[in-house]
Every structure is written in C-alpha cells, then in structure tokens.
C-alpha cells in the first residue's frame, strides 16, 4: 500500500537491486515463522527477568498483531511508538511488521513538542507509550497527544498502571489464542515488500525531524548485510544499550540482524557502566553498539577497576559521532573484543571498518560502504568530484538509501540531486585504504552524545521568549558528550534573561530535555558574514571560554 508523500526508487534502480539479490521481494514479517521453526526454544530476547524463546516471541507478535487489527487498526496505518528498551518494544515492532503497520520510532526523551508533530505528520492512528519512565508521566502525555491528533483512535500503554481510557499493551501481547489461525490471517494480509516497514527520524537541520521511509525490501537488506559484515551468528549475544528506536541498535545489525541469525537480544534501559557491564558479564554479551561518550565511560569504569571487562565481548561497534583516536586506541586493550567504527545514517548508507582491518585503519577511519552497489561521491561546493584525500561533501545513493523524505517535497529538492544522490551533509575525505574519514558536518547540527539536534529548531523555540531580539544556537565542546547546546542571544533593552529561565520556558513548551541549552551567552550583537548571515564559525570560537554554564544533564 503506497502512501502519498512516499518517494520510491526509480524502476531501473529497483530492478537492478532485485536482480543483484539485495531486495528479496518479501516483507520483513514473513521471516518470523522461519526464525521460530529454525531456532524454536532458543532464547531470543532477554529483558530483566523476562526471557522469551523464538517460538514464544513469534507467538506473542502474532497475537499482538491480530489484536491490533481487532482494535480497529488496518494494514497501511502508522503507529507512533515511544517505548523504552524492553521486550514490549521488540514484540510490538515485530507485530507491526506482521500486520503491515509502520511504526514511527520516537525516542523516550521526546516530549509533546516533538510527539505532536510526528503524530500529525505521519497521520498515525495509534500511539504506544510506557506508563512512566523515572519521574515523567508518559501516559498522560500520550493521552494529550492522542486527544490533539484527530487520526488517533487507540492509545497503548506498557506498564503496571494503565488508565481506563488506554489499552494495556502487555495484555494485547499475550500469545495468539489460535496460533495456526493467527498465522494464516496475517499471511493473507502481508504487506508488499516495497511498502513502508518503518519510519525513522532524521537528525535534520531545518527544525523538527524529517521522517525517513524504510521499506521492507531495503530494511531487510540493511539488517541482513550488516549482520554478514559484523559476523553475527546463532552464538551471538547482542546488547541493546542505545535507545532501540534508533537505526543503529535496531538494524545495524542490531535487534533485527541478531534475530535473523538466531542470536540472543539483551535489552538494557540505560548504558550506564554500573548497570551495563555486570549485565554484559552475566549474559555473555558478544556484541554491542555505543556512541563515543558511552564508550569513554565504559573504558573509565574498567580501567579504574570499578568493573571487570566484559569477558565474552567480540565486537564493539562505535558510531553516532566521530570517535577520537585516543579513545579508539584504548577500546580494545581495556574492553576487549574488536573495535568497529560505524559511520552511518538513518537515511541509509552504512560504512563499517571490518573486523580484520589493521589497527591503524580501525582507529583512524570510519569504515567503507557495506554494499558493492553503494555509490559515493566526494564533491566540492559546485558538486565537482575532489581528488582522493581532499575534503569534500559526501553524496550517496544505493539499495538501502531512500530517494526522499516523507511528505517533504521542498526539502527533498535541496537534500537530493535530480538524479537521486542524497546530500548527507557530512564533510569527508577518502583515505588511501578506500575507507572514509569523517571531518565534520556542513549542516547546522549539534551532536550531543549521538543525538542530533537542529540548531534552527532550538533557535525558533527561543525566539518565542519575550524580549529575545536575535538568537543563534551553536555547539560547545563537552568532554563527555562531545558537544552540547549553547544559546547566544541578543535581548531587547531592559530584558533580563538567564540560562535557568530559558530552560524553564522550553521545558514548559514540552521540548525534549536533551535539546535544552546548557550554556547561555548574552551579547550586544551577533557577528555576521559578508553576506549578512550569522557567522556561526566565529560564534563557536567565542563560546569556548565565555559562556555561563550548567552541568550537562
């Protein structure tokens, strides 16, 4: 079922990807019963005291899929999913794939500002949230978003306290009452392999996130090929420590790549060393994915003697931001296993260093494309290719890089060339080994511990505050997170503005906490370039030593 606003691959490219065997012409959900039949009573998912075998997981996914349809949802619908790492997330994702419902992968850190936009833009018919996480009432927010979104008819809540106006997700996720009938029903309504399997979120520079449409064809290949490159098999035990709705832990190879190969998925609610390192030891974790800030904490915890190194670790993937060489050099000696740098994006292209690469390649580069038909160009400002070794903007296209964002024609005209090349916004150079080295971004993004924040979005929010005349949001270096948000503001005469008041105002707007400024600099005027634009390069130099600061949250 094709949605209006979805940009398909051109027929010539699609035919080529099918002929090459990248696209197998099967929806992702059609593989589940093969997994159950092959791996049966092998443990598939571990979430605290909950352990589900492959057979149990698939029975629950089928049961949930049928009950979602019985609740009024239809194949082709979209569901806003904001669940923490847990068995409910895995089961619901698989159920959606079986029923032809496309999950919109929101983050647990998102608040009403983001959720209302995502729900409206994707025209979701259902929302799935936890009851509470920490001190935040997600159920209450989910109820508000549902009431504000006319298309929503079902609010699902995972947790021990479910309101009378919501539906208990855990109860719906019981095994199918009649497994044979449920399987036959879902097989009959299976989506087309070219349909949207999942909506991922961009780290866009132009305000709120863009929706990335990943089809069953391309996302199945994304996970399958990633698992091949990373060497996952039925003995693999993969730890999900990053938010599971991110592309990285979901399908690079992540949850899907592990389940395809009969491995075990272990879910952690937090990447904090005190929780994760003992869990890795107890479950015999062999592979995991992390961002540089998390890896640094793990290294410090092991090197200081607070925790032993994970004894079974074979593969440590690091991505989401560039890994400093000095940290990369310590990863293998301290944590064990093989370091794999990952440079990828929810929009498609995945670059991996290979496990058998020499140490200098694993430390100094961010990998090479995983597919022979991944096309890359490194170009100058006029889109002319630059010589190998010189820096330029990265363009790409391939069998798992979509040709456009969802319902974003105007943005697509800027983000994609007429012949389908995606402008990634990354500045790279080609290493003599053929790998890519990431030098930075040509887009206005702030990378806070792997979460990409649009400077423009933060600026537009601060502009709503009384007395703000001009504002620029820039990245400030952070020793743990890599970068954090610094707001540089010009105020109208007589206006008093503090960091605390800005954060309080944005919190009241229901903005995700990780987007809140952590530094504020009030200035008389903003520096401008020769063409009258705010000179952010100069501002980044200024904020290095002149901002009032709060502790990173």
Curated annotation (Swiss-Prot):
Secretion signal, residue range per the UniProt entry: none
Keyword field contains Transmembrane helix: no
Description of what induces expression: By salicylate.
Phenotypic effect of disruption: Cells lacking this gene are unable to degrade salicylate.
Reaction catalyzed: salicylate + ATP + CoA = 2-hydroxybenzoyl-CoA + AMP + diphosphate
Record keywords, A-Z: Aromatic hydrocarbons catabolism, ATP-binding, Ligase, Nucleotide-binding
EC code: 6.2.1.65
EC top class named in words: ligase
One protein family per Pfam: AMP-binding
Gene Ontology molecular function terms on file: acyltransferase activity, transferring groups other than amino-acyl groups; ATP binding; medium-chain fatty acid-CoA ligase activity; nucleotidyltransferase activity
Annotated positions binding substrate: 246-247, 533
Any Gene Ontology biological process: fatty acid metabolic process
InterPro entries: AMP-bd_C, AMP-bd_C_sf, AMP-binding_CS, AMP-dep_synth/lig_dom
Protein origin, superkingdom: Bacteria
Binding site for ATP: 203, 320, 342, 426, 441, 533
UniProt function note: Involved in the degradation of salicylate via a pathway involving coenzyme A derivative. Catalyzes the conversion of salicylate to salicyloyl-CoA via the formation of a salicylate-adenylate intermediate. The substrate specificity is strong, since benzoate, 3-hydroxybenzoate, 4-hydroxybenzoate, gentisate, 2-aminobenzoate, aminobenzoate, salicylamide, salicylaldoxime and 2-hydroxyphenyl acetate cannot substitute for salicylate.
Family classification: Belongs to the ATP-dependent AMP-binding enzyme family.
Name the UniProt record assigns to this protein: Salicylyl-CoA synthase / salicylate adenylyltransferase
Lineage per the UniProt record: Bacteria, Bacillati, Actinomycetota, Actinomycetes, Kitasatosporales
């Amino acid at each position: 079922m094709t949605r209006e606003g979805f940009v398909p691959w051109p027929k010539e490219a699609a035919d080529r990807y099918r002929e090459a065997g990248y696209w197998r012409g099967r929806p992702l959900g059609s593989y589940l019963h093969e997994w159950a039949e092959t791996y049966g009573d092998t443990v598939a998912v571990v979430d605290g005291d909950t352990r589900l075998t492959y057979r149990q997981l698939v029975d629950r996914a089928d049961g949930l899929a049928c009950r979602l349809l019985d609740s009024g949802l239809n194949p082709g619908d979209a569901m806003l999913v904001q669940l923490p790492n847990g068995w409910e997330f895995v089961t619901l994702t698989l159920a959606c794939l079986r029923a032809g419902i496309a999950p919109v992968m929101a983050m647990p850190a998102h608040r009403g500002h983001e959720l209302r936009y995502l729900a409206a833009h994707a025209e979701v018919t259902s929302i799935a949230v936890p009851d509470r996480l920490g001190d935040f009432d997600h159920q209450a927010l989910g109820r508000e978003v549902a009431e504000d979104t006319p298309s929503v008819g079902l609010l699902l809540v995972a947790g021990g306290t479910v309101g009378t106006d919501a539906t208990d997700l855990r109860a719906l996720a019981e095994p199918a009452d009649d497994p044979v009938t449920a399987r036959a029903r879902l097989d009959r309504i299976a989506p087309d392999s070219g349909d949207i399997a999942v909506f991922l979120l961009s780290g866009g520079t132009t305000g709120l996130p863009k929706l990335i449409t990943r089809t069953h064809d391309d996302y199945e290949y994304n996970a399958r090929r990633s698992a091949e490159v990373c060497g996952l098999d039925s003995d693999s035990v993969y730890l999900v420590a990053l938010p599971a709705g991110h592309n990285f832990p979901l399908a690079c190879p992540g949850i899907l790549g592990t389940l395809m190969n009969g491995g075990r998925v272990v879910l952690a609610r937090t990447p904090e060393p005190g929780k994760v390192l003992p869990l890795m030891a107890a479950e015999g974790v062999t592979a995991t994915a992390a961002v540089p800030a998390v890896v640094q904490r793990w290294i410090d915890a092991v090197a200081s003697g607070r925790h032993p190194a994970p004894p079974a670790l074979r593969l440590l993937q690091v991505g989401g931001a560039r890994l400093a060489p000095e940290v990369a050099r310590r990863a293998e000696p301290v944590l064990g296993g093989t370091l794999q740098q990952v440079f990828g994006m929810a929009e498609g292209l995945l670059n991996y260093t290979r496990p058998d690469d020499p140490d200098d390649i694993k430390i100094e580069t961010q990998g090479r494309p995983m597919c022979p038909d991944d096309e890359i160009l490194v170009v100058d400002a006029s889109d002319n290719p630059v010589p190998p070794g010189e820096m330029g903007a990265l363009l790409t296209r391939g069998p798992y890089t979509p040709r456009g964002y969802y319902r974003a024609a105007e943005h697509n005209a800027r983000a994609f060339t007429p012949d389908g090349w995606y402008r990634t916004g990354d500045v790279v150079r080609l290493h003599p080994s053929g790998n890519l080295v990431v030098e930075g971004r040509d887009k206005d993004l702030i990378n806070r511990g792997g979460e990409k924040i649009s400077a423009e979005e933060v600026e537009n929010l601060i502009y709503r505050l009384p007395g703000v005349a001009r504002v620029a949001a820039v990245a400030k270096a952070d020793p743990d997170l890599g970068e954090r948000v610094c707001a540089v503001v010009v105020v109208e005469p007589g206006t008093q503005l503090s960091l605390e008041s800005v954060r309080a105002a944005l919190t009241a707007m229901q903005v995700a906490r990780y987007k809140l400024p952590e530094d504020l600099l009030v200035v008389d005027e903003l520096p401008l370039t020769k063409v009258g634009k705010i000179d952010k390069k100069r501002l980044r130099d200024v904020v290095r030593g002149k901002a009032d600061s709060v502790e990173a949250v």
